[in-house]
């Protein structure tokens, strides 16, 4: 096994576990509030979706810090390392009040927006109650993302994973107490989430303080605006790419709705099942970005080799996942609670989605090389074009049912994937050292 593959596996494994833990938090809350009725489940479900979208905002700070810190670490540039850490925290301080305070103030119209017109008054009230705690608590999630970004930039992906598992363990322990025993309902679910993440954040800050080299200037010093601007310039394309892809997934629901109600339900259930696979692609992408940035900082031009290993790793995972979905589709959708026409449609979707998964895996893996090289902006354009094309093709092919939608997804992903592969082959071998 080559050096690059070993390093990618070592970095990606913990990142994958961390991403799975993030999804598990919403599942834990849903399981406990399910005993309170459908309105409570709807409130927690839509609030979790909102949180996922908001997470894309703070990726500007977390991802930007990771890449700049990894590059500076590779170059042995202590001042650039300090600047990356400062820039990440400055962005957190700027963005968090806008989201937390603004979200709390606008929780009522936000609840109405995400639940849609004609929503049940009970569900609206419960969603507002959940947002009243969860949106101010987003400050904790944002801070945890920055802590994780710093640790990953230092080459440590295991500690963020452990912190996520700690938070989930606390949520699992607190949910039955707060939701049921103390009769706090959805407020209890929101409170347990904030408390669990807060404890994990405090532990992360303590560990981070020990990991950062001793010396002045890590969290204070001159040039704060320049530091923040550098992190934002690096992280913004990654954040935009995430948000565009999330928006495209949501928009595709409207196209699927033209096919039928069972197909919409099947698409929603199958998409959740696909998260297990797609999160592994994003884990490889993060690992590739960290490794690439570190190599560039060290003056080693090996982006082509790293990209090839990332393609092999992510593509291999996609092939295995596609084969598993093809064989186990009925059991997967059944295990997620689907039955009848929904189960049939969900199984068909999972059996047709394999080519899309493989192309997506390759595109996401190559994205890590561009992120680590500071050229992620090109990915934003490719992703945006791909999402627009996906919607147009899905609309045109919706007459063929879910197989037509899967074909549209594959075709729309093939074009940006081919463009990314061509750009990867033509990467300038000259190494740009961080200034």
Predicted region positions:
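Small-residue-rich hydrophobic transmembrane alpha-helices
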Residues: 41-101, 141-160, 264-329, 362-374, ...
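Helix-terminus/linker motif at the lipid-water interface of multi-pass membrane proteins
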Residues: 24-42, 111-121, 177-184, 239, ...
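Membrane-helix boundary and inter-helical linker elements of multi-pass secondary transporters
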Residues: 34, 71-74, 153, 182, ...
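N-terminal transmembrane alpha-helices
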Residues: 3-31, 35-36, 49-64, 68, ...
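Transmembrane alpha-helix boundary and packing residues in multipass membrane permease domains
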Residues: 15, 19, 27-31, 48, ...
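Short alpha-helical transmembrane segments in multi-pass integral membrane proteins
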Residues: 1-15, 69-137, 181-236, 292-356, ...
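Short runs within selected transmembrane alpha-helices of multi-pass transporters and secretion channels
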Residues: 62, 133-152, 160-171, 189-205, ...
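Transmembrane helical elements of multi-pass membrane transporters/channels
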Residues: 10-29, 133, 144, 167, ...
């Amino acid at each position: 096994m080559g050096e690059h593959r070993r390093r990618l596996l070592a970095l990606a494994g913990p990142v994958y576990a961390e991403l799975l833990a993030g999804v598990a938090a919403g599942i834990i809350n849903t399981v406990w509030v399910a005993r309170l009725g459908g309105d409570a489940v709807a409130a927690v479900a839509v609030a979790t979706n909102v949180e996922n979208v908001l997470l894309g905002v703070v990726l500007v700070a977390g991802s930007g810090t990771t890449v700049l810190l990894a590059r500076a670490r590779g170059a042995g540039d202590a001042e650039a390392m300090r600047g990356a850490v400062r820039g990440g925290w400055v962005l957190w301080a700027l963005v968090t009040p806008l989201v937390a305070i603004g979200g709390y103030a606008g929780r009522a119209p936000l609840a109405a927006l995400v639940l849609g017109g004609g929503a049940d008054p009970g569900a609206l009230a419960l969603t507002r109650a959940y947002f009243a705690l969860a949106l101010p608590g987003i400050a904790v999630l944002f801070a945890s993302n920055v802590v994780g970004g710093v640790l990953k930039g230092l080459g440590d992906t295991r500690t963020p994973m452990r912190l996520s598992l700690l938070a989930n363990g606390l949520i699992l322990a607190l949910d039955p107490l707060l939701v049921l025993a103390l009769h706090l309902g959805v407020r209890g679910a929101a409170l347990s989430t904030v408390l669990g993440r807060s404890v994990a954040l405090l532990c992360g800050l303590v560990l981070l303080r020990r990991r950062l080299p001793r010396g002045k200037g890590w969290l204070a010093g001159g040039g704060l605006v320049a530091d923040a601007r550098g992190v934002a310039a690096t992280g913004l394309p990654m954040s935009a790419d995430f948000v565009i892809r999330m928006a495209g997934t949501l928009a595709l629901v409207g196209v699927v709705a033209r096919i039928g109600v069972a197909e919409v339900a099947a698409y929603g259930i199958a998409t959740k099942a696909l998260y297990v696979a797609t999160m592994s692609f994003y884990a490889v992408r993060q690992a590739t970005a960290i490794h690439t940035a570190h190599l560039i900082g060290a003056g080693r031009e090996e982006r082509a080799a790293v990209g090839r290993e990332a393609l092999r790793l992510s593509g291999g995972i996609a092939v295995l996942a596609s084969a598993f979905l093809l064989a186990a589709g009925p059991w997967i959708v059944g295990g997620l609670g689907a039955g009848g026409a929904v189960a049939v449609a969900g199984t068909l979707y999972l059996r047709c989605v394999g080519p899309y998964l493989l192309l997506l895996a390759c595109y996401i893996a190559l994205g890590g090389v561009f992120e680590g090289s500071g050229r992620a902006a090109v990915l934003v354009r490719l992703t945006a074009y791909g999402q627009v094309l996906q919607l147009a093709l899905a609309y045109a092919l919706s007459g063929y049912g879910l197989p037509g939608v899967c074909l549209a997804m594959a075709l729309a992903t093939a074009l940006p994937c081919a463009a990314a592969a061509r750009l990867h082959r033509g990467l300038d071998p000259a190494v740009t050292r961080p200034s």
